[in-house]
Amino acid sequence: MSEKDTTPSTQQGENGPGQTHPAQGPAGAAEQKWHPGPDPRRNPGMPLEAKDAEACENSLRGRLGLLPVGVKLPVKTRRQGWVAAAIAALVAFVTRFSNLNHPHAIVFDETYYVKGAFSLLRKGYEGAWEGAEKANELFLKGDYSALKDNADRVVHPPLGKWIMAAGQWLFGSDNGVGWRFSTAIVGVLAVILVARIAMRMFRSPLLAGFAGIAMALDGMGIVMSRTGILDNILAYFVLLGFWALLLDREHSRAKLAKRVAYGEFRSPSGAPGAPRVPADPWGPRVIGRPWLFAAGIFLGLAGGVKWSAIYAVAAFGLAAFAWSLSARRIAGVRLWFGAGVFRDGLPAFFALVPAAVAAYLAAWIPWFADSRSWGHDLAKEAVKRGEGLPLTGAPDAVNSFILYHKDMWHFHHTLSSHHDYQSQMWDWIIQRRPVSFYWLGADKASNKCGAQSCVEAITSIGNVAVWWLGLVALIVVILAAFRHKDWRAWAILAGYGAMWLPWISYTNRTIFQFYAVAFLPYVVLALTFAVGVAAQIVGRAHSGQPRLSFGLVSSPARPVWRQNVPRPKGVRSQLRNAIAVRFSDEPLPPGAVSQSPSGAPQAPDATSAFPPSAAAQHFPGAPAPAPNTADDSALPGLPAPSSTPAPNTADDSTDATACPPNMPVPTPNTEATPSDAATPHLERDETSRFAPDAGEANATETGAPPSWHAPGPYSPMPAAPPEFHSPNPNVPPIAAPPQKQWWEPPAKRMTGVFFVGLVAAVIVAAAAFWYPLWTGQNISHSFWQLHMWLPSWI
């Protein structure tokens, strides 16, 4: 026998690859030492078994903020969400369509857009109108003789006016319903969409209804829906893009979780029981992002209404990129930043930006189709002046199109003529300078108010309860974004960043407060988020996130106090001890003890390690910990949290290790047995408060891997609530109520529901007080003065 044959053999067995076989006998026991095995850089990846891959996928989905595969919210909850949206839609319909024909006058900038829409409907292009006030008076009488054949110079893309022309085509051009129908219906649809977005973000019908009502009763939203101008249409298309962005986040993360879980894994160290990561350091490719493509379409159409939508393309694109980086980091991808750039960032760019450009160009098809439109001769005029063309050799229509855009750019960046109602972007969030859209003084208004002096007024001031409370809510959202890395807070901030912050570069330009209607939905979502946090009814953003609470409403009482059982001495301590076993989120209270299988008390050891699954030994009937009821990083079979803080990627990543971290690593040219794949070693937790059993202690001393294994994937739903025993034998066991899954909203408390109702009541009261000034009703002059709280509102 050669010297090589006398060495201990290494085989693939139940102790894992690269370990000495246990059948060597006593003579070779001293030589049996564990070694790391082959070079991990040459260690090929191995896929998981189907049941382990399924458990891994659901664990990843939880940490990525997604429900498990095939799991939906309860039918009752979903129905309540739709009912909440329907109620909000009804309120929005009444407030926007009631007496929509009043006032029968061209209001504010309707002189540009209503007549422009009529010209598109009548001629196919925007013609010039002869005379200003005279043309408006004739238009109100149905006399359109002021419309001439020569084209009018317009400074906005045509899509918004084509949409407004649809209302005139349906209801005629001689009444306010025809002029304003399109903007009114868009306003109602925006309310429904905000309610559905809130339901998707917060998973609470109560908060969805609150968001819908707040959106439906905001004064700026009502005024802009009852006026034939472009900004309401712009806001709706951007909101559609935001909705598609949220769907893309879910869709792309679900794909990533599935491909990681069913892909190949390897151990960086090659050691048995070591954490596992995807074999590909770049992670899997996520091909196909249809919802991001849809977001590009919606944002491109928004740009076809007004150019300010271009900032939404940039802001939402950055949000999608940041979420992709965070998702790969959570999934344990080693080169997560590079993969986020090249495998997610570039494909996302080519899904979003070209779609937006194509949709924007599609909005100009009528302009290309009709040579009578303004700007078609710009290329020829430039050649006559001896100027060069933007694209030499391109058709005149293309060069004229580019020159037309240069002309619009120059107009928007040089408009600085003074206006009585102009304001700055920082004035908008406090509603300092609203715009007077319509005013009929006492000398012209009919005397229908019952007072000596009656007036009719329409002002664009928002609901002060929404906007002023929204300013406080914005602070809460910023705290949640930076402190808790809550993706919902970052999504709301993306809306602010898209439609509000860019105006800071236009301080020298004439701009108006009603532009803020474009980010009104995000003000409402911020207020909803803050109210939900204060009322403690906002669910978790992902499986590892604690409940958000800023102490504005008292925390819920412990479940034990809701039960009709006596509270003898020691019950509170033993209950907290038991809950700490389940959640691993709080220290043992003084005097708390654990219960051994035999019933004798055992002193807790806060420094030793013990498998969390052994809680059933100390508390009979306790199920295995559910991976979605606590921080996944604290459970066996799931990755340990990284000590490196997560990057500021607008998400809530908690770790950087893929699941499952403790699978034995099969050596090359071997197959993993079912027991190898299905029984991962549980990682030792040095922070556990329980002492190891004898087998674990012996295994630790000999250097061998732990002898206990997880029985398989953990069930996400406990079979039965455990019984928690008191050290006092005279105290009967207390059954703790079953714990909710992480995605379920917390139980509603009367104080929380009352708080939400109180804020909603304030919003309704403010809307009732201001509604006459949002709709131009005939009111007394003194009643109008009662609403002018600030001198800048006059």
Task: Indicate residue ranges for each PLM-predicted region.
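Short acidic/glycine- and proline-prone juxtamembrane loop motifs at membrane-interface regions
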Residues: 106-107, 179, 183, 220-233, ...
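Transmembrane helical bundles and short interhelical boundary loops of multi-pass, membrane-embedded
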Residues: 2-16, 283-291, 324-325, 335, ...
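Aromatic-rich transmembrane-lumenal/periplasmic boundary elements in polytopic membrane proteins
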Residues: 97-140, 347-348, 356-431, 778-789
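Transmembrane-helix signature of polytopic, membrane-embedded enzymes
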Residues: 75, 87-88, 177, 194-217, ...
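Transmembrane-helix motifs of polytopic, lipid-linked glycan transferases
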Residues: 181-202, 240, 476
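Start-transfer (signal-anchor) and selected internal transmembrane alpha helices
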Residues: 1-95, 343, 347-356, 631, ...
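Short helix- or helix-capping micro-motifs
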Residues: 92, 211-216, 223, 299, ...
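Specific aromatic-rich, kink-prone transmembrane helix
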Residues: 193, 233-282, 298-299, 523-529
